[in-house]
């Protein structure tokens, strides 16, 4: 089995391509279920954010797995593999494990050290579990990754000086307008990104705020927190007439603001400029609007320069986290290496329990007057003896599994205990196809 990551991210693909490969939240479970049925894919988790779409997979063959994951992406988004391939980055084995740790800890983010990605990874993992797309390997790996990411942020200061994309959008507005107190601000979208932007705007002095959302009740709840006003998206054109600053993050599949709409609005704005930041992927605002004289449009890739602030300080903290990651990878690989011994241990336990069961049957024949309570006590104590006898051999087997030449040593181990090869192989199949174990994931 092999661990594989297929990634489209802000480093390798511009926003105009990333938006073509973005999974909507409502379709993520269906996508993971579909991918799980692809040839070679044993486990999978799909992560899709404004800066990356990544498929994490356990595959039985690297070459076959790579091909069918690429094919899945192309088919899902109705593109040709040749269109998708140039923008893909592929990580395998240790590189894939390291990449997952780095992404979850915020080391691979546009804003190094940001914490939002940790929640996004956790949500994707839990959704994958719900549709039974994860198994033994990813249940352990993602549990370990999420735990380390929390520890990394609590034991270092990397997140203290990191700004979110939403914060960067507000900072860009402040550079252009200076004080925001008298600016009319329009927020499109009442999701996490929109609320983060509004929170930062409010902290920067903005008080003339309007929140718009397809569901008016969500806009009302968000606006009330920050003394703003809520409006339905049906009133968008009127709201654009009043706004000085627009920050959009609706997550719609089509443009919310078109060039045609903005052309009409500009004619009625009497030459007043409108500063627009589109932090949605797919984009909410038609990029052709930037051609208009009075509209100044920035997308998420344009914020790169803004988020460079305090980068040197955060990179020092990132080095500490990378060291923590490397230690954790060693622990995971040690655990992974012991998976091969699980069938052997199971076969050993089964054989011992079979002997105990046969002994109990023989004992009950020889002493037929035993009460049910006496039978339970004898059974419990004989099982306890078995567990004590097996404890040391099992520990030794696990240690052997992590050593070089483990297969030959484990074969000798099986021979000593006279374990049938077929029985061990049968147990190995059970472990490989196990899909039911669900770990407790630490809350964020």
Swiss-Prot record:
The keyword Oxidoreductase applies. One of its GO terms (biological process) is protoporphyrinogen IX biosynthetic process. It holds the Pfam family Shikimate_DH. Substrate binds at residues 49-52, 109, 114-116, 120. GO terms for molecular function: glutamyl-tRNA reductase activity; NADP binding. The record marks 99 as: Important for activity. The active site is at residue 50. Its EC number is 1.2.1.70. It is an enzyme of class 1 (oxidoreductase). It catalyses: (S)-4-amino-5-oxopentanoate + tRNA(Glu) + NADP(+) = L-glutamyl-tRNA(Glu) + NADPH + H(+). Keywords: NADP, Oxidoreductase, Porphyrin biosynthesis. Pathway: Porphyrin-containing compound metabolism; protoporphyrin-IX biosynthesis; 5-aminolevulinate from L-glutamyl-tRNA(Glu): step 1/2. NADP(+) binds at residues 189-194. The keyword Transmembrane helix does not apply. PANTHER family: GLUTAMYL-TRNA REDUCTASE 1, CHLOROPLASTIC. NCBIfam families: hemA. Possesses an unusual extended V-shaped dimeric structure with each monomer consisting of three distinct domains arranged along a curved 'spinal' alpha-helix. The N-terminal catalytic domain specifically recognizes the glutamate moiety of the substrate. The second domain is the NADPH-binding domain, and the third C-terminal domain is responsible for dimerization. Belongs to the glutamyl-tRNA reductase family. Homodimer. Catalyzes the NADPH-dependent reduction of glutamyl-tRNA(Glu) to glutamate 1-semialdehyde (GSA). During catalysis, the active site Cys acts as a nucleophile attacking the alpha-carbonyl group of tRNA-bound glutamate with the formation of a thioester intermediate between enzyme and glutamate, and the concomitant release of tRNA(Glu). The thioester intermediate is finally reduced by direct hydride transfer from NADPH, to form the product GSA. This is Glutamyl-tRNA reductase. The lineage of its organism: Bacteria, Bacillati, Bacillota, Bacilli, Bacillales. The gene is hemA.
């Amino acid at each position: 089995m092999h661990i594989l990551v297929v990634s489209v991210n802000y480093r390798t693909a511009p926003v105009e391509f990333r938006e073509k490969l973005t999974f909507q939240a409502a379709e993520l479970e269906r996508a993971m279920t579909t991918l799980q049925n692809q040839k070679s894919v044993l486990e999978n988790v799909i992560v899709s954010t404004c800066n990356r779409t990544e498929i994490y997979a356990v595959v039985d063959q690297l070459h076959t797995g790579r091909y069918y994951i690429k094919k899945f992406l192309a088919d899902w988004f109705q593109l040709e593999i040749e269109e998708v391939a140039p923008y893909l980055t592929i990580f395998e084995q240790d590189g894939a494990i390291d990449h997952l740790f780095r992404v979850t800890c915020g080391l691979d983010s546009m804003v190094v050290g940001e914490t939002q990605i940790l929640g996004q990874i956790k949500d994707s993992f839990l959704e994958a579990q719900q549709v039974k797309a994860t198994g033994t390997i990813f249940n352990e790996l993602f549990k370990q990754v999420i735990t380390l990411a929390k520890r990394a942020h609590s034991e270092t200061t990397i997140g203290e000086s990191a700004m979110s994309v939403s914060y960067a959008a507000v900072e860009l507005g402040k550079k252009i307008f200076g004080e925001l107190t008298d600016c009319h601000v329009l927020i499109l979208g009442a999701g996490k990104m929109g609320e983060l932007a509004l929170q930062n705007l409010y902290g920067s002095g903005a008080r003339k705020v309007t929140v718009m959302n397809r569901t008016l009740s969500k806009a009302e709840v968000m606006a009330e927190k920050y003394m703003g006003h809520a409006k339905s998206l049906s009133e968008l054109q009127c709201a654009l007439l009043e706004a000085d600053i627009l920050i959009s993050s609706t997550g719609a599949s089509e443009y919310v603001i078109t060039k045609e709409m903005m052309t009409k609005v500009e004619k009625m704005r009497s030459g007043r400029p409108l500063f627009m930041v589109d932090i949605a992927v797919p984009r909410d605002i038609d990029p052709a609007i930037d051609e208009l004289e009075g509209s100044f449009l920035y997308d998420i890739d344009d914020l790169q320069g803004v988020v460079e602030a305090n980068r040197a300080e955060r990179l020092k903290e990132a080095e500490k986290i990378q060291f923590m990651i490397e230690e954790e990878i060693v622990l995971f690989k040690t655990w992974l290496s012991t998976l091969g011994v699980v069938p052997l241990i199971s076969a050993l336990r089964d054989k011992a329990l079979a002997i105990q069961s046969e002994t109990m049957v023989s004992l009950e024949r020889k002493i037929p007057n035993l009460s049910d309570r006496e039978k339970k006590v004898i059974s419990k104590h004989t099982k306890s003896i078995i567990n004590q006898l097996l404890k040391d051999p099992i520990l030794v087997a696990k240690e052997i599994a992590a050593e070089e030449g483990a297969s030959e040593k484990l074969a000798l181990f099986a021979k000593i205990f006279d374990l049938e090869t077929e029985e061990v192989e049968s147990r190995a199949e059970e472990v490989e196809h196990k899909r039911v174990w669900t770990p407790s994931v630490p809350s964020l």
